[in-house]
Amino acid sequence: MTRRIPERGDSRHLIERGMSSVDMAGWRCGILGSASLIEHLRKEHRVKRICLTGGLASGKSTAIAYLKAQGASVIDADKLGHIVYETGTQGYRKVIDAFGEDIVGGDDMIDRGKLGAKVFGNPDELKRLTDIVWPEIRHLAELEMNSYEALYPDGVVVLEAAVLFEAGWEDMGDQVWVIAVEPAVAIERACARDGLDRDAVQSRLDAQLSNDERVAKSDVVIENNGSQAEFFESLQAAWEQLNQ
C-alpha cells in the first residue's frame, strides 16, 4: 500500500498560526527529535535520498507527480528559492545588503524585476546573487529532508532541482537521477507548452548544461524522448531498482 506523504498544504493549521514554511520544518524537527535521533533513524531504516534534475522540457514535473504517487516525499528547490526572498528571512536581508535598498518595493518585498535588471546580462552580478541564494536554498532543503526523514524514516525523499549541478547540491542525495531529452524534442515540447519561438528556446538550452554533462555526473539516466507511457515505464524501472 502506498503511504500518503503530507505536503505543505497539509500544515494549514500551522500557517494559520503564523508559521512560515521554514518555521514548520524546524517545528517538525523539534517535535520529533534531535539531529542525532534523525541520524540514528537513517542508519536503522536506510532512508533513501534522491536528487532529480533535468533540462528544459525534460519532464521533471511529470516525474515528480509519478514519484509522489509512489509515496515519495518531494522537495521543490524552486519553491524554496521563493522562500529565501520572503520578507524578514536571512536571505532577504543578505540580498538587500548586496544589491541595495532600491530593490525593495512599497510592500517591503524584494521586487524581482528590479533585482533582475541588476543581474541580467551581468555574469559577475548573477554569480554574486546565486552565491547568496543557493546556500540558503540548500539549508532549507536540508531542513525539509530531515523533517521528512524523521516523519517517515523508511521512506524516499526526492530533491528536485533544475540547477542541481550548477549549485553543487548533488552530494545531498544517495543517488542522482537525470532526465535526458534530445534537444530537438525539448525544443518542440517547450514551443508547444510555453508558446515560445524556437530561437528563444534554443537560447535557453544553450545556457544550460548539456545532456552529456548531466549524464556524466548522474547515477541513473531516464530518457524521455518518446511517449508518456514509455516515460512512465522508465520511471517505474528506476523506482523498482531503488527499492530492491
Which sequence ranges carry the predicted segments?
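ATP-dependent small-molecule kinase phosphotransfer cores
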Residues: 79-156
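Walker A (P-loop) phosphate-binding motif
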Residues: 45-72, 77-79
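Short, Lys/Arg-enriched N-terminal segments with co-localized hydrophobic residues
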Residues: 33-46
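Small-molecule kinase domains that catalyze NTP-dependent phosphoryl transfer to phosphate-bearing small molecules
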Residues: 141, 170-172, 188-241
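ATP-dependent NMP and nucleoside kinases share a basic, alpha-helical "lid"
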Residues: 142-151, 157-192
